[in-house]
Design a protein with these regions (language model features):
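A conserved ligand/cofactor-binding region detector
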Residues: 1-239
Length: 239
């Protein structure tokens, strides 16, 4: 459905970035700048940077659909993408601009980068390889998508207490994930277990355990290019 509309693209000037970060903090996160903590400022910055990637992402998707190009689909149980703020800033070429904007607001970019949780989506070479493939596809301008699982927890947090290792759950989504877009209308039933019931020449899969798989999309930017791709992760929901 083509509906005519107009909008103003977010600009990359230091002043515009300052306004955008403050706006996200107040109207998206709902926090008073006077009492916001570092993680809330981090999320506001992530939302502001994401805004500046969305337009090229949608443009890439539109071009791929209109040209009916072939795409590479990379399926992996893990995507060890790591912290994404610094990568996004370098890909967009706005690292210094965001650094200056935050400095003028009394904040430190490096400190905010350190606040970002490492996504618990992988823990080894398999996940790192998958993430590198997605980065390379975007940097080379090759249409592609990654498909994986949106784990709620990473491996575990490790602390040393009285000389012994103590493990605790690593809930990496504790502060949310501003990079992702939840796709409420893209859900599928996934069934486990059960048994096969034979009815003449037909067979039915019955007495199964069902969950819903819901899609979450994340932008994968290419370095120094308008090309972007998508990482789609599936989250398990109660049916």
């Amino acid at each position: 459905m083509n509906v005519p509309f107009s909008y103003a693209s977010p600009t990359l000037s230091v002043e515009a970035l300052k306004h955008s970060i403050a706006y996200k903090l107040m109207f998206i996160i709902g926090k008073d700048p006077a009492i916001a903590n570092k993680h809330e400022w981090l999320n506001a910055t992530l939302f502001a940077v994401r805004d500046r990637m969305v337009e090229r992402w949608l443009r890439s998707n539109r071009a791929q659909l209109s040209q009916e190009v072939r795409q590479v689909y990379y399926l992996s149980m893990e995507f060890l993408i790591g912290r994404t703020l610094s990568n996004a800033l370098l890909s967009l070429g706005i690292y210094e601009d965001v650094n200056s904007a935050l400095e003028e607001m009394g904040l430190n970019l490096e400190e905010l980068i350190d606040e970002e949780n490492d996504p618990g989506l992988g823990n080894g070479g398999l996940g790192r390889l998958a993430a590198c493939f997605l980065d390379s596809l975007a940097a080379l301008g090759l249409p592609g998508r990654g498909y994986g699982i949106r784990y709620d927890y990473g491996m575990f947090k490790q602390n040393i207490v009285d000389g012994r290792q103590k493990e605790s759950p690593d809930y990496w989504l504790e502060y949310g994930n501003p990079w992702e877009f939840e796709r409420h209308n893209t859900r599928y039933k996934v069934r486990f277990g059960g048994r096969i019931q034979q009815e003449g020449k037909q067979a039915r899969w019955v007495e199964t355990e069902e969950i819903l798989a819901e899609a979450y999309d994340q932008i994968i930017p290419g370095f120094d290019t308008d090309a972007t791709n998508t990482l789609r992760l599936w989250s398990a929901q109660a049916s």
